[in-house]
Amino acid sequence: MEMQSVTHHVSGAMPAPLRIGRAAPGRCCILAWLAFIALPHGVLAQDLSANTRLLAAARAGDQTGVGKALADGASVNARNRVGETALVIALKNDQPTLAMTMLNAGTDVNLGAVNGVTPLMAAAHAGQTDLVRLLLGKGAEVSAVDRLQKNAMTYAAGQGRTDTVVLLLRAGVDPNAIYAHQLTALMWAAGYGKTETVRALLNAGASAELRDDRGKTALDIAREGNFVETVKQLESPARP
């Protein structure tokens, strides 16, 4: 999805549930097939039936089925036709227990889907802060970007996942980092009217003076979205 205005930059750029980086018609199928035939870590040499059952169980949120498939030899890094591992599927579907199972089984925490969505991005989007913390501890790449040049911080900020945003800041993410279209995390939060997240970012040193590639500040973006409380927060010199 291209982002050509503030509305498209922010509000229209993160539909829910997690739908990120769709390719043009035709390309998607080709990319998905290439991802399937290039599965890493020797997946094709293993029991494809067990792999298929693992992914189906993950999609259904079936903890028992996941455990059985793993016991039967399924690869922890098996991926479906769009390149999603059971871990990514679990995180997208808000199945933290299942996600923990896959993490404990040794799934590659940086193995993303065809669209580039990594486990950390999926967890950040869902606001699964404990899992974000665990992923970071296991070496998840915090600066990884997907096909739309978005990352864990932009997803967390846009979704108003304040606890996750604070955790990412503590992990070393610059509150004034510039992302695609010269957007900052503050702009993403402002564009969705996430006042609490805006406040947390301001308190962490995020600048309200930065401008995107249209010359708009976070305040301008909040005004365009008619987010009254967010506008008040950005206008206020005191930010309790």
Summary of predicted features, one role per range:
Residues 62-70, 95-103, 128-136, 161-169, ...:
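Ankyrin repeat structural motif
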Residues 29-40:
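Bacterial N-terminal signal peptides
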Residues 46-85, 89:
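N-terminal segments that cap or nucleate solenoid repeat domains
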Residues 2-6, 44-53, 171, 203-207, ...:
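Ankyrin-repeat-protein effector appendages
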Residues 56-61, 89-95, 122-128, 155-161, ...:
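Ankyrin repeat A-helix N-terminal signature
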